[in-house]
Regions:
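Positively charged n-region of N-terminal signal peptides that target proteins for export
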Residues: 1-5
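Bacterial N-terminal signal peptides
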Residues: 7-17
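Noncatalytic, solvent-exposed loop/strand surfaces
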Residues: 20-418
Length: 418
């Protein structure tokens, strides 16, 4: 497997870790926004054609595989138990499996393996929907373990916990935004990645009611100038926090203008350069300018749209902003102004839950039947290919070293050249 030199732009994008462009170290990839700098990626495939290998999986999951060089890590449910798998990328074999805990529960599109692992290239960190958070080295040695529910109380989300940790420098950032099944406050916490100890834990207040405090999103990382902030969406608002202390620096309301009691949020915040894009339950999606303090609901609002997604997280290259809703309707907007470039273009009918990824001037969109539509990036809607895997799929694609990895209910596929 060849390794490419890093483009200077990629160094800026990937400064959150030591990852190379060919790695996919966390759910939304090397730049934390679903964008990869990879080139010459596969465009067409079937279950038998253009498949480098496939590995049998015991269960479906919303968790995305993460990749570092020749290692792939997966959060896996096997019956009642939950495991971290380490897979040899070159041999398509399981190197080791480590038990994370038991108590797997299935709830519609959710089970307790939904959070994706993260890695810094030395160790891997994984959380389960049951609140178990563990660290392992690449040989499978357990370094530390936490039980977040035991420490801070039971999770109270209607559909179970699904947020992935955010890894930044020497810390993990974990959010627990809930309210449907608990009166306990929502919170955000920072954990030392070396020891597993809590550095800080702050409450995140909300006026959202019933199910609307619940958030299945993953924290985002905003970097502009010399400033770094942790971005959290849920509970009818989006907030920015100081990584050093957890202090809330700014807040934008408006994600639930009608105070709908069932406005839980699934799609995660997208950050590109100095713009924060905050989806909610379809409408509205807000675009906010970085740099604000206090209430920025109006002062830093760049644009909004009523044509947001529910489950799939959108993607942007900084020029165009791409949205696919749960029914497979696609929009392209101007990323800076929100002006519609094209709208209501229908992909193949189906239900869409996986998040969009963008690479090689293409957008990859996978539906729940395992069909990936490849759309040319740019101002003109053009479908390049429709690629069926004919299997249940909730997991988002991962891209690494010229190959695409898609996890279905029965297989992990490595797509591309062997």
């Amino acid at each position: 497997m060849k390794h490419r030199a890093l483009h200077p732009i990629a160094i800026v994008l990937l400064s959150i870790s030591f990852a190379h462009a060919e790695d996919w170290p966390q759910w939304r990839g090397p730049s934390l926004n679903g964008v990869s700098t990879e080139k010459n990626l596969p465009v067409k495939w079937t279950t038998e054609e253009n498949i480098a290998w496939k590995l049998s999986m015991p269960e479906w999951s919303g968790s995305t595989p993460i990749i570092w060089r020749d290692r792939i890590f997966l959060n896996v449910a096997e019956g009642n138990d939950l495991y971290l798998w380490c897979v040899d990328r070159t041999k398509a074999t399981v190197l080791w499996k480590k038990l994370l805990g038991s108590g797997n529960v299935k709830m519609r599109k959710q089970n307790m393996s939904s959070p994706s692992p993260v890695t810094d290239g030395r160790n891997v960190y994984v959380m389960t929907g049951t609140g178990i958070l563990k660290s392992f080295d690449f040989a499978g040695k357990e370094l530390w373990t936490r039980d977040i529910q035991k420490d801070y109380g039971a999770f109270g989300l209607n559909w179970g916990y699904a947020s992935s940790p955010l890894l930044f420098e020497e810390s993990l950032y974990v959010q627990v935004l809930h309210g449907m099944k608990t009166d306990d406050p929502s919170y955000v916490m920072r954990i030392d990645k070396k020891t597993g100890k809590t550095i800080w834990k702050v409450e995140r207040p909300t006026t959202a009611i019933r199910e609307s405090p619940d958030s299945y999103t993953t924290p985002g990382l905003l970097r502009y100038g010399k400033t770094t902030e942790i971005v959290i969406t849920g509970g009818d608002c989006v907030t920015g926090h100081d990584p050093a202390t957890g202090k809330e620096l700014w807040r934008a309301n408006g994600l639930n203008p009608e105070n709908n009691p069932s406005y839980r949020i699934v799609a995660s915040p997208i950050i590109f350069n100095d713009i924060i894009y905050a989806p909610t339950r379809v409408r509205p999606l807000l675009a906010l300018r970085a740099g604000g303090r206090g209430d920025i609901s109006t002062s830093h609002l760049l644009w909004s749209t009523i044509n947001g997604p529910d489950v799939p997280t959108p993607v942007t290259d900084g020029k165009y902003f791409y949205i696919v809703n749960d029914r497979g309707i696609m929009w392209c907007l101007d990323a800076k102004t929100g002006a519609e470039i094209y709208g209501q273009q229908r992909l193949k009918p189906g239900t869409y839950s996986a998040s969009l990824v963008l690479a090689d001037e293409k957008i990859y969109v996978t539906n729940e039947e395992g069909l990936t539509t490849v759309v040319r990036a740019g101002p003109k809607f053009e479908v390049l290919a429709e690629n069926p895997l004919n299997d249940y799929c909730l997991s988002s694609p991962a891209i690494s070293d010229g190959q695409i990895f898609i996890r279905t209910a029965t297989n992990l596929y490595c797509i591309g050249k062997k």
